[in-house]
Amino acid sequence: MFALTDKVIGNLQMATFAAFGGFATLVLSSFAGTRREKLAAHAALAVAGSVLLTIGTAVTSSTALAAIVTLPVTFAVFFAGIAGPNAASGSTGALLAYVLPAASPGTISMVPDRLAGWWLASIAGTAAVLALSPRPGEDRLRADASQLAAGLADLLDAALGGAATEARLGDAMAAKHELITRFTATPYRPTGLATPDEALANIVELLEWCTTLVADTIRERADLRNASRQERDLLEAAGSVLHDVATLLADGRTVPDLDRLERCRAESLAWLGQLTPERPGFRAAARLSFHADTIAGVVLATGAAALVARGLADPEWIATTRSRWHHGPATARLQRPRRRILSLAAVARRDASVRSVWFISSLRGAIALAAAVAVADLSSVQHGFWVVLGALSVLRTNAASTGSTALRALAGTAIGFVIGGALLVAIGSDSTALWVALPIAVFVAAYAPGTAPFAIGQAAFTVTIAVLFNLLAPVGWKVGVLRIEDVAIGCAVSVLAGILFWPRGLSSLVGDDLADTFRAGASYLTQAIEWASGSRTGEPDGGTATITAALRLDDALRAFLTEQGTKHIGKQELWRLVGGSMRLRLTAHLVAGLPRDATGMGAARDALSHRTGTLVAWYERLAELVGKPRGKPVADLEPPAFGPVDVVKVGSGSHYGIWLCEHLDHLSEGLDELVPPASRLAEIRRRPWWR
């Protein structure tokens, strides 16, 4: 396209935007999914780029106007990444269509030529992607989820047959770790806003928790041959559904029998209700019933999510499930386009907070780029575009990592200048040699990101630009010197923005979001226990807040783990804290869905209330530990201690109260493991940001 527009058509504006449009389409943006999904993503990039290009050209005549308009425009582009991985991956390419005209001289009359170049590059680039991209490989995330579901089903079958072993349990735990590692290996949540994507994300979370529940059951009672018929039937039905989920996720069409699992669960609860608390072995039976019912509840949700993920549930049921995840019953029967709009609006509301990594990163990026546009114009550099691109290329989530990246960017640019300058001196004015060198330079620049160090990518890009600009307007090696100067200015702007607006970056946000998840989960647990024990008249309504906090934490943690620089805290320590918050939230969710007993609790209600209060107070202290330091030293935190008043006694006469107490008892296990990583995070938050 560059050769066509430069040599055949002979239009400088068209050639420039064809060249950089190709970079935006093929180098800066990488879309995943099927060919249809890639086509839709590239089409959206082309349309968005056209709008941004027009706006950028319109504001370039005024420094103040360009800087002011850059703030909302770049914020909107960055923030649009909440829609999914492809939207996030296309943000830099879309911004290139804006910053190139906004930071370069031009008039509104140039818009048609620039759009023509942009669309030529978009069409050619999209065609190349669709024609030359390899066939989509196996969906490894779905495959890993299928493998874990099958492993859990086999483990339950083995326990029912008295053949559960530590080796089988170890295999299941290894499969869980592999699934979570793959799910968390990308900077963006590997699912979008579509209902099947949401369902797959839920499956990952549910299977992780189900693994913990099954492991706890096996470790407590590995041989279930002597369990009651009702509990055996329930666990056998749960294993059958897990087998069907595994087949379904592996492209099968088997529909899990959720109705049978529901019936077995109801029979198990009814059987437990017929037992008297004074009966020998009642507490052991109640504990096994708790394990079986908890596993069944999680497996039911997993089976439902699998049906949605594979598109086998009817639209009405999908809508109801979707509303339960994000909105509420009011949106259950809306038509699909409107549900899509409301879903986007709900996610936007969720992330419109200083607790959201999307909001804070978008705001910081917008301020840095607006400042870069203003500095580029006021400093009268020859190529202001490079100032803005320099700022964009080194933006990171904290000042220290931005500064580190800035140094690598300058080093890479200097290396590229030396190589490019030597190449131009050797080639001289031979345009044929430059045309031969251009595709080689482009190949290296496109291949380097993700496969070579950041500085190497910067060097390759500088060589490409040196060759490209000498084809457009021969100036020899001087273009390299100019780019070093401009990139240095842009890097300085990004570093300054990082110091002023977000010096600590994501480490502080991860702590704040962890605190929010623990507080929201503790509040939801209180509501759930009060509802199930009959002391609350209204149904629990804290579920939405816990989901919002969990999703914000997920986004912040992904960005933190993919951020360059020293972390000072291990990934496993962070995931132990995240797992603790998830266990709290899902326990509250499960209790909130249990039958309500408003009359038969008796003295058990006071014990449950006291035990819940002790747990909630501990989670509040944990949230305070990982939250904002507020000038306080790191406080010692001991696991909660429960006294006689916190235990529902067998003599209370309430089998349901004893059963609910098992939920709280299970949640209390392992809380001491959360203290060391929480204290470590608290210490990090109290260090100076530059350390």
Can you say where each PLM-predicted feature lies in the sequence?
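Active-site acid/base region of carbohydrate-active enzymes
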Residues: 497
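Alpha-helical transmembrane segments and their membrane-interface boundaries
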Residues: 1-128, 132-133, 303-459, 465, ...
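Long, hydrophobic alpha-helical segments that serve as membrane-spanning/inserting helices
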Residues: 4, 8, 30-31, 132-370, ...
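Active-site-adjacent mobile loop/cap segments within catalytic or ligand-binding domains
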Residues: 579
